[in-house]
Amino acid sequence: MQGGVAEDAQSLTVGMSRDWQWEKQYRYGHISGQWQGEVARWHSDSQNSTQLGVTPALRWRPNGWDNGWFVEGGIGVNVIFPKYDTRKKEFSTTFNFGDHIAIGKRFGADQQHEWSLRFQHFSNGRIRNPNPGENFLQFRYTHRL
């Protein structure tokens, strides 16, 4: 579950993630990956849109950050419908890319809880103009099953 704010909108998101079977220990920390799927509702000043996305993400836990801290980043594909349109911005495509970077922390007896602060950018990658993009600052809570 995550909530976010942008210049022209607010978002509420639900989703699921699945850890990859791959992980690697490097000199400067541990890297793992996961698939993230999400459904969001964006509320803007002129209309509401639904966002569906799938994102592969990499997570880095630096050596010395033993208390569950991590840094994460990913780039995925999204469908936003109807096309995002506010008084200030108008997307020209329904298909968009979404990339994010986050810092977060796992906690709980079994590390089953997690929070993160994320910056996420959506745009069509210059497939068509206009391509103003939208940036969200998001707070995310995850409960691992």
Describe each PLM feature range:
Residues V14, G133-L145:
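Outer-membrane beta-barrel "beta-signal"
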Residues G3-T13, W42-S49, W65, R126-P132:
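Solvent-exposed loop/turn segments connecting transmembrane beta-strands
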Residues Q25, G37-Q51, G73-K89:
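Outer-membrane beta-barrel translocator/channel fold
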Residues Q21-I31, S46, N63-W69, A109-Q112:
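Short loop/turn motifs that connect adjacent beta-strands in outer-membrane beta-barrel proteins
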Residues G3-A9, R18-W20, G37-H43, I75-F81, ...:
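Transmembrane beta-strands of outer-membrane beta-barrel pores
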Residues S17-D19, E23, A57-R61, N96, ...:
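Transmembrane beta-barrel domains of outer membrane proteins
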Residues R59-G104:
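Surface-exposed, polar helix/loop patches in the mature regions of secreted/periplasmic/lumenal proteins
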Residues M1, Y28-G37, L52-V54, W69-I75, ...:
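Transmembrane beta-strands of outer-membrane beta-barrel proteins
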